[in-house]
Amino acid sequence: MSPLKKEKLNKIRKELDKLDDSLIKIIKKRTNLVKRVLALKEKKNQIVDQKRIKLILKNIKKKSINHKIDPKITNKIWRNMIYAY
């Protein structure tokens, strides 16, 4: 790889690292909200709400298409987040 390409690659990687830092902060906020929801649901024995999950995934698919992102990718990401808890 040429030095110029290596420099460009490193610059892109630094941008990705910064973006990853931002994503971690957002995931932390989402995790805190999910924990609050779970605390309320545990009292009602309603941990998994399939209707809500379907609605979330439907909305994510629409938003992905609008932003020209492959909905298969975002579907996998959101499913993993949802079922991680």
Predicted regions and their residues:
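Domain-level signature for soluble enzymes in the chorismate/prephenate branch of the shikimate pathway
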Residues: M1-Y85
